[in-house]
Regions:
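Amphipathic alpha-helical packing elements
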Residues: 2, 6-36, 40
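Conserved mixed alpha/beta catalytic, RNA-binding, or beta-rich assembly cores of soluble enzyme
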Residues: 36-218
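Intrinsically disordered, low-complexity segments enriched in polar/charged residues with Gly/Pro
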Residues: 1-2, 138
Length: 218
């Protein structure tokens, strides 16, 4: 790609096996859109490749936890842990929105605001806070949960695995420096692979299937 400074245009050539296949001429205001388009194309390619590699080989949540304990030293967080409390709160919100939105009345489904309107955005954020408060006040048996939080630590890095055994929900998140993030990215991919998917998950493109695909092409 050739680039010129100032207000000059940039010319991008995307090559193919038989020579250039696409040529884009972009001014300064179009460069970001061009880069986003290229990123989207790369992601779609990675996703398609990941989907081809997936086969039905599921394991249970309990088996996945034991695998992570044996291989990575996974430990369970106490119910008083601040991370446990926060993740359980988020899970309750998600479950109420998915399973019992009628309990929230007009707060159940909020239209997205005009992002160019600061007042509308602030009003939307206020509604989100009101919805969170309303969900927090609902009794826990509205959406029964059996939530557990597990952790893998590496220096200052941390990987968290949240599991609800009633809803068969597994989520992974991690943080840390660059080295820890690279390590945990591979760990998360390995855990999602081990948890796996069933033939029905593949056929129906279930949430479990989508999570695995996302992990493999991230």
């Amino acid at each position: 790609m050739k680039q010129h400074s100032g207000n000059a245009i940039s010319v991008s050539v995307i090559g193919g096996a038989d020579g250039p296949t696409s040529i884009f001429v972009a001014g300064p205001g179009e460069k970001r859109a061009l880069k986003a388009g290229i990123r989207d194309s790369i992601y779609r390619y990675k996703r398609k490749r990941a989907e081809k590699r997936i086969v039905a080989a599921p394991h249970s949540l309990a088996e996945t936890v034991q695998y992570a304990k044996d291989k990575y030293g996974l430990t369970e967080a106490a119910a008083t842990d601040s991370d446990y409390i926060e993740q359980m709160r988020r899970l309750k919100e998600n479950l109420v929105l998915r399973q019992k939105p009628e309990l929230l009345g007009s707060l159940g489904e909020l239209p997205e605001p005009d992002l160019t309107d600061e007042t509308a955005v602030q009003a939307f954020l206020d509604l989100l806070e009101a919805r969170s408060r309303k969900i927090a006040q609902l009794p826990d048996d509205v959406v029964p949960m059996d939530f557990h939080l597990y952790k893998i630590k590496m220096g200052d890095g941390l990987l968290q695995m949240g599991i609800d055994y009633i809803w068969q929900d597994l989520s992974l998140s991690y943080s840390g420096n660059r080295a820890a993030m690279r390590k945990f990215k591979k760990t998360a991919e390995d855990l999602y692979r081990f948890y796996g998917v069933s033939a029905a998950d593949i056929q129906n493109h279930s949430a479990r299937y989508t999570a695995l695909v996302s992990a493999l092409c991230s």
